[in-house]
Design a protein with these regions (language model features):
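C-terminal transmembrane bundle of multi-pass solute transporters/carriers
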Residues: 45, 55-59, 66, 70-72, ...
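Helix-loop-helix hairpin linking two adjacent transmembrane segments in secondary transporters
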Residues: 93-96, 143-180
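Loop-to-transmembrane helix entry/capping segments in MFS-fold secondary transporters
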Residues: 39-40, 129-139, 248, 333-343
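Helix-loop boundary and gating motifs at the non-cytosolic
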Residues: 1-54, 209-258, 347
C-alpha cells in the first residue's frame, strides 16, 4: 500500500481518533463552564490546551525530522490515550478539579502537537506532489466531518449518558488511530543534505534562517499571526455567546452545522483543487471570513449564527488547503518537521494571549458596559442589543473589523501577495505512486 491509498488508510484511523477527541474537547469545555460559571476559567483551560504545544513546537519539529516517523506517531497516539485514561480515572472517582484538567490538557497539547507535525510532515513522503491538493482537501473533509458529528453528539451525550461515558468512548477511539499506524508501512525520512550533527537548538535556528531567506514568507507569517489572534479570540467567545441564550445541545448543533460547511468546503476543494494563485485563495477567504465575523453576533438567533458559521467553515478549507499545499511545495522535505512546527508556533503563539485577553475584555469591560444604561450599551445597543451575551457579541464584531484591516495590510505588501509565484517549487515528489 502506498501513495493516496496509504494516506487514506492512516487518515481513516486518525479520523476516528479525532472524533473521540472532539467529543471530549467539547464536553469538557461545557462541563468546566457550567460547573464554574466563569468565562475566565473556560479560557484558562483553552490556554492550557494550547500553550505547551506552542512553546515546545519548534523542538518537537526538530525531533520529527530526526526520528523514525512511525515510532514517533505511535508514541504520540499512545501518550494521548494515557492522558484521557487519567482524566477518566479522576472523574470516575470524583477527584477531578480545575487544576487537574489544566495539567492534563497541557500534557495532551504536547502529544497533539507531535501527532499534528508528524502527520503533516509525513504527507509529502506518502503522496506525490500532484496529489497534495487532493490529500489536503481530504484532510479538510475529515476535520469537517469531525466538527459535524463531534459537538452535536457531545451535546446530546452530556444531556443523556454524561461525561464519564464520553471519556470512555474517547479511549476506545484511540485504538483505531493506533491500530492503523501500527499496520501501515510509512516511507523513511530522507537524509539531510549536510552530513553534520547539530543540536536541536541549532536546528530550530536553522529552520528560522531558512524561513527568513524566503521573501515574503516570514512577513506573511507575522501578519497571519495577527489574524490568528483575532480568530482565536472569537473561538474562545463563541461558545459562551451561544450558551448565553441556548442549551448545550443547541450549542453542539451550531458546531455541527459549521461542520457541514467544512465538509462541503473540503469536497469542493477536492474537485476544484483551489485557485491557481494560492495566495489569492488564502487572502480572499480570510477577508470574507473577517467580514462575516462582524455580522455573525449581531442577532441572538440560532438560525442566524448557524448560517454564518456554516459559511465561515465552508470558506476555511480554501485558505487552509491553499496554505498547506503552498508550504509543502515551497519547503524541502527534510525541513518539513522544523519548518511546519516553527510556522505553527509563530502563528499560534498569539492563541493563549487571545484566549486570556478575550476572557478579560468580556468579563471586565464589554459585558458590564453593555448592560442597560451603561456607556457602550447607549452607543452600540441599538445594533448589538443590551444585556447578557451582548458584550461578547460586540467584542466578536470588533475582532472581525480588526481582521479586515490586517488582511488588507497583507494584500498590499507585494512580497506576501506574490509568495506563491516568486518562490520556486522544491523537488518533494518522493512518494511512491
Amino acid at each position: 500500500m502506498s501513495g493516496l491509498k496509504l494516506f487514506y488508510f492512516i487518515l481513516f484511523g486518525q479520523s476516528i481518533s479525532l472524533l473521540g477527541s472532539s467529543l471530549t474537547g467539547f464536553a469538557l469545555g461545557v462541563w468546566v463552564y457550567q460547573t464554574s460559571e466563569s468565562v475566565m476559567e473556560f479560557t484558562l483551560i483553552l490556554v492550557a490546551s494550547t500553550l505547551p504545544g506552542i512553546v515546545l513546537g519548534p523542538f518537537i519539529g526538530s525531533w520529527v525530522d530526526r526520528l523514525n516517523r512511525k515510532s514517533l506517531l505511535v508514541g504520540a497516539q499512545a501518550g494521548s490515550a494515557l492522558i484521557i485514561m487519567g482524566l477518566a480515572f479522576l472523574y470516575y472517582y470524583d477527584l477531578l478539579r480545575f487544576w487537574h484538567i489544566a495539567v492534563i490538557v497541557s500534557l495532551g497539547s504536547v502529544f497533539a502537537t507531535m501527532l499534528q507535525v508528524g502527520f503533516t510532515s509525513t504527507v509529502t513522503l506518502m503522496v506525490p506532489t500532484e496529489d497534495l491538493n487532493k490529500a489536503n482537501a481530504a484532510l479538510g473533509m475529515v476535520l469537517g466531518l469531525v466538527q459535524l458529528a463531534g459537538p452535536f453528539l457531545a451535546g446530546k451525550a452530556l444531556d443523556t449518558i454524561g461525561i464519564s461515558t464520553i471519556l470512555l468512548i474517547d479511549i476506545v477511539s484511540f485504538s483505531f488511530g493506533l491500530g492503523t499506524l501500527l499496520l501501515a508501512s510509512l516511507p523513511s525520512t530522507p537524509a539531510k543534505p549536510a552530513d553534520t550533527q547539530t543540536s536541536v537548538w541549532e536546528e530550530v535556528k536553522e529552520a528560522y534562517r531558512f524561513l527568513k531567506s524566503k521573501p515574503g514568507v516570514l512577513g506573511g507569517l507575522y501578519l497571519f499571526t495577527l489574524i490568528w489572534f483575532n480568530v482565536s479570540a472569537v473561538q474562545a467567545l463563541i461558545t459562551p455567546l451561544v450558551l448565553s441564550y441556548a442549551s448545550p445541545s443547541e450549542a453542539g448543533l451550531i458546531m455541527s452545522v459549521a461542520g457541514v460547511g467544512a465538509l462541503l468546503g473540503g469536497a469542493v476543494m477536492m474537485g476544484w483543487k483551489g485557485p491557481e494563485r494560492r495566495m489569492y485563495g488564502i487572502l480572499g477567504a480570510a477577508l470574507a471570513i473577517a467580514f462575516i465575523l462582524v455580522l455573525l453576533p449581531v442577532y441572538s438567533s440560532l438560525v442566524w449564527i448557524g448560517f454564518w458559521a456554516f459559511v465561515i467553515m465552508a470558506l476555511a478549507p480554501v485558505a487552509t488547503v491553499c496554505s498547506q499545499t503552498l508550504w509543502q511545495r515551497k519547503v524541502p522535505v527534510h525541513f518539513h518537521g522544523r519548518a511546519f512546527s516553527l510556522r505553527n508556533t509563530i502563528i499560534k503563539a498569539a492563541q493563549p494571549a487571545a484566549f486570556l485577553s478575550a476572557g478579560f475584555l468580556y468579563q471586565s469591560v464589554f459585558e458590564p458596559l453593555m448592560k442597560e444604561g451603561a456607556l457602550l450599551a447607549n452607543i452600540f445597543g441599538p445594533i448589538w442589543g443590551i444585556g447578557e451575551g451582548r458584550g461578547i457579541a460586540l467584542l466578536i464584531s470588533l475582532f472581525g473589523i480588526l481582521s479586515i484591516v490586517i488582511v488588507l495590510m497583507a494584500w498590499s505588501i507585494r512580497a506576501i501577495r506574490t509568495a506563491d509565484t516568486a518562490l520556486p517549487d522544491e523537488n518533494i515528489s518522493r512518494a511512491a505512486t
